[in-house]
Amino acid sequence: MQPRVVILDYGSGNLRSAQRAVARVGAHATISSDPHTALEADGLVVPGVGAFAACMRGLRALRGDRVIGKRLAGGRPVLGICVGMQILFERGVENDVVTEGCAEWPGTVERLDAPVIPHMGWNTVDAPAESAMFAGIDKDTRFYFVHSYGVRTWEMQTTSPHLKPPLVTWSTHGTPFVAAVENGPLWATQFHPEKSGDAGAQLLANWVATL
């Protein structure tokens, strides 16, 4: 049976392209803004484009932040894409305005420190060797990015021997920034896997395989 995946419609993101990309790798993908439907799906994709603050307003308007929290509390997979990854952090800072995020991870989304903004186009990533997200993907593969803001410092410290620390993948545009995170049922990418060709399809297939 195909796993059921909901692409969360909260007024932001490349909904149709994400839906098509997830469907192509074997899931039954639908677009929905209904919190109950999003909560009950086998997998939830949280897309996002544009401003951090606008995305958080849209997400909170349909209680999407609570849906994400409830899913993760129950170990149910969530995949954040682009600003859908950024809003998983504690806060975003745009034009000196601070907006609270979902706070699944500590850290601040801020403007990239680079001579050319936005970061638009193809770039390589440095993924941990044990990454399940990047399984079957060559190390020098490029993914498609389009963003002006990102997480430049990973602040989460895990010292307990009983807790598995998140796997953090980095990329560089001017200075390093977080390109992807794997944290149990919560995966997220700053780049767009749905626009990243065969490599993006492999990544999405790896995620669907966890459902």
Swiss-Prot record:
Residues 4-211 form the Glutamine amidotransferase type-1 domain. The active site is at C82, H192, E194. The keyword Amino-acid biosynthesis applies. Pathway: Amino-acid biosynthesis; L-histidine biosynthesis; L-histidine from 5-phospho-alpha-D-ribose 1-diphosphate: step 5/9. It catalyses: 5-[(5-phospho-1-deoxy-D-ribulos-1-ylimino)methylamino]-1-(5-phospho-beta-D-ribosyl)imidazole-4-carboxamide + L-glutamine = D-erythro-1-(imidazol-4-yl)glycerol 3-phosphate + 5-amino-1-(5-phospho-beta-D-ribosyl)imidazole-4-carboxamide + L-glutamate + H(+); L-glutamine + H2O = L-glutamate + NH4(+). One of its GO terms (molecular function) is imidazoleglycerol-phosphate synthase activity. It is found in: Cytoplasm. CDD domains: GATase1_IGP_Synthase. Keywords: Amino-acid biosynthesis, Cytoplasm, Glutamine amidotransferase, Histidine biosynthesis, Hydrolase, Lyase. One of its GO terms (biological process) is L-histidine biosynthetic process. Its EC number is 4.3.2.10, 3.5.1.2. GO terms for cellular component: cytoplasm. InterPro entries: Class_I_gatase-like, GATASE, Imidazole-glycPsynth_HisH. IGPS catalyzes the conversion of PRFAR and glutamine to IGP, AICAR and glutamate. The HisH subunit catalyzes the hydrolysis of glutamine to glutamate and ammonia as part of the synthesis of IGP and AICAR. The resulting ammonia molecule is channeled to the active site of HisF. Heterodimer of HisH and HisF. This is Imidazole glycerol phosphate synthase subunit HisH. It comes from Thermobifida fusca (strain YX). The lineage of its organism: Bacteria, Bacillati, Actinomycetota, Actinomycetes, Streptosporangiales.
